[in-house]
């Protein structure tokens, strides 16, 4: 029986989710269609309702609607609640369920490159993207997790929710880290957060949550120029999609060849 899925966001034309899920479908021999829905700021909640009334099986949610999707759901997973945002929706017993697969997607992609246990980790940015990855990073038992933001107060808001983290302003960063994660939106507008020289001098592994299929993101290019190994978030996109696919279809697809295929476009 044909299953129906979609991703909703605004903008949405650039989304790779339909391509990724169709490759998962071929691999697992599940018949599905996966569409793009341009989100309407005024009618977003109605769009969600209509999708499931019309026999939709699962819906991914991307910017800028993850918080609204979270608020709309009746039942949320623990990781969704801690993230305060939802990217995966489905109906069960006539109730809207929500999950957030971004964090687990990041951890699975990072595991290709380094072990997180006992590492010193720096997150740049204190917005929704940062909040969504703190809990899974803490579960990996790092030695230290610091959230740095241009305005310290916003980072302190996250610290109140996650007391295990430390916070700093960008200017206060002087120590070395094993891993730096860019969770700011700077790369989306080709801007770079210039870090103190000491922070990059020990050549940390650098990871940008943003991705650019055609070229390197500004953060990846900047940190590579500083001599660091750096990757963008395309792998995270594929891994979070795999987790959503598993939630909906109870089958976990393989991701490595799909990621290689997307990198070779």
From Swiss-Prot:
NADP(+) binds at residues 125-129, 149-154, 209, 233. GO terms for biological process: amino acid biosynthetic process; aromatic amino acid family biosynthetic process; chorismate biosynthetic process; shikimate metabolic process. InterPro entries: Aminoacid_DH-like_N_sf, NAD(P)-bd_dom_sf, SDH_C, Shikimate_DH, Shikimate_DH-bd_N, Shikimate_DH_fam, Shikm_DH/Glu-tRNA_Rdtase. Pathway: Metabolic intermediate biosynthesis; chorismate biosynthesis; chorismate from D-erythrose 4-phosphate and phosphoenolpyruvate: step 4/7. It catalyses: shikimate + NADP(+) = 3-dehydroshikimate + NADPH + H(+). One of its GO terms (molecular function) is shikimate 3-dehydrogenase (NADP+) activity. CDD domains: NAD_bind_Shikimate_DH (cd01065). The keyword Oxidoreductase applies. Its EC number is 1.1.1.25. One of its GO terms (cellular component) is cytosol. Keywords: Amino-acid biosynthesis, Aromatic amino acid biosynthesis, NADP, Oxidoreductase. It holds the Pfam family SDH_C. Shikimate binds at residues 15-17, 62, 87, 102, 211. The active site is at residue 66. Belongs to the shikimate dehydrogenase family. Homodimer. Involved in the biosynthesis of the chorismate, which leads to the biosynthesis of aromatic amino acids. Catalyzes the reversible NADPH linked reduction of 3-dehydroshikimate (DHSA) to yield shikimate (SA). This is Shikimate dehydrogenase (NADP(+)). It comes from Legionella pneumophila (strain Paris).
């Amino acid at each position: 029986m044909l299953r129906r899925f979609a991703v909703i966001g605004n903008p949405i034309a650039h989304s790779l989710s339909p391509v990724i899920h169709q490759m998962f479908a071929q691999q697992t021999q599940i018949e599905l269609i996966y569409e793009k829905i341009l989100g309407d700021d005024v009618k977003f909640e109605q769009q969600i309702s209509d999708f499931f009334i019309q026999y939709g099986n699962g819906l991914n949610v991307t910017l800028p609607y993850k918080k609204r999707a979270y608020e709309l759901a009746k039942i949320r997973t623990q990781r969704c609640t801690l993230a305060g945002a939802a990217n995966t929706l489905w109906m069960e017993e006539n109730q809207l369920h929500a999950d957030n697969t971004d964090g687990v997607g990041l951890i699975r992609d990072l595991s290709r490159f380094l072990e997180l246990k006992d590492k010193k980790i720096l997150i740049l940015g204190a917005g929704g993207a940062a909040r969504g990855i703190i809990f899974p990073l803490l579960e990996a038992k790092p030695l230290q997790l610091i959230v740095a933001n241009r305005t310290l107060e916003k980072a302190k808001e996250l610290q109140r929710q996650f007391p295990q983290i430390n916070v700093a302003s960008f200017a206060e960063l002087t120590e070395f880290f094993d891993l730096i994660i860019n969770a700011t939106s700077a790369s989306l507008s080709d801007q770079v957060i210039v870090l103190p020289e000491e922070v990059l001098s020990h050549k940390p592994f650098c990871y940008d949550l943003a991705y650019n299929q055609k070229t390197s993101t500004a953060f990846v290019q900047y940190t590579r120029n500083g001599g660091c190994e750096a990757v963008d978030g395309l792998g995270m996109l594929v891994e979070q999609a795999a987790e959503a696919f598993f939630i909906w279809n109870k089958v976990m697809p393989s991701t490595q060849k799909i990621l290689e295929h997307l990198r070779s476009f």
